[in-house]
């Protein structure tokens, strides 16, 4: 009686793009896998021939804006635009892990843009603390 055995290993090389945004800024992809189009500024006309996971800065495994997303080659310092976040970013935002809410930028059809909500500051974050007199002890101007 003979035996036959085979072993197989599968290696998947995955490339990641870590961004300074996170689920605090846009919770929908982390909660239920919502799709948001992502572009790389200045590379809109380049081929989307590199596959990435676009990950946020939280220490949570579901803090991802995209999984297996084809984008142009992304280099350190490139700016990514996560589209169509309008009503969901700030309204669903929260301060998990002490993360501050980001500013909101409106991209107009003609390509111009404007800031419609400033970024949250540490002073904003601590303004509602009402214990240990912490707000008055922090030097926000340092």
Set out the residue ranges of the language-model regions:
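Single conserved hydrophobic/aromatic residue that forms the stacking wall/gate
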Residues: 1-7, 11
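C-terminal accessory subdomain/extension
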Residues: 12-17, 21-142
